[in-house]
């Protein structure tokens, strides 16, 4: 079964926190996730999540959530979507494909049930 998974990534590239949904196409808001983001805000560099059935793009919901997070934290984070064949990143208002990918991208695919 595939599912969307979220990793909170630290400035040193470590996975600070993770959670998963029960759906391959949605990662509903979670109080636990919001609390983790707030508690880890000084260490948090990036929020990554999977799109196990695609697309390799940020959704409208992703975009509005990213804007809300940046406003709440008072700074811009880096965001990424890991899809079956590619990884995209949004950093400083630019969106691009990332290659090579960080070490945790394969782990995110595995946790998401991607083939």
Protein language model features and the residues they cover:
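Conserved beta-strand-loop surface patch within small alpha/beta domains used
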Residues: 1-44, 52-115
């Amino acid at each position: 079964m595939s599912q969307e998974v979220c990793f909170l990534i630290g400035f040193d590239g470590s996975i600070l926190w993770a959670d998963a949904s029960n759906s391959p196409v949605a990662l509903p808001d979670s109080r636990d996730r919001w609390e983790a983001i707030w508690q880890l805000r000084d260490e948090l560099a990036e929020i990554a999540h999977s799109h196990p059935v695609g697309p390799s793009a940020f959704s409208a919901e992703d975009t509005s959530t990213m804007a809300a997070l940046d406003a709440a934290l008072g700074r811009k984070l880096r965001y990424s979507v890991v899809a079956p064949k590619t990884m995209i990143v949004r950093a400083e208002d630019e969106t691009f494909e990332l290659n090579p990918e960080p070490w945790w991208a394969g782990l995110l695919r595995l946790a998401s049930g991607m083939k």
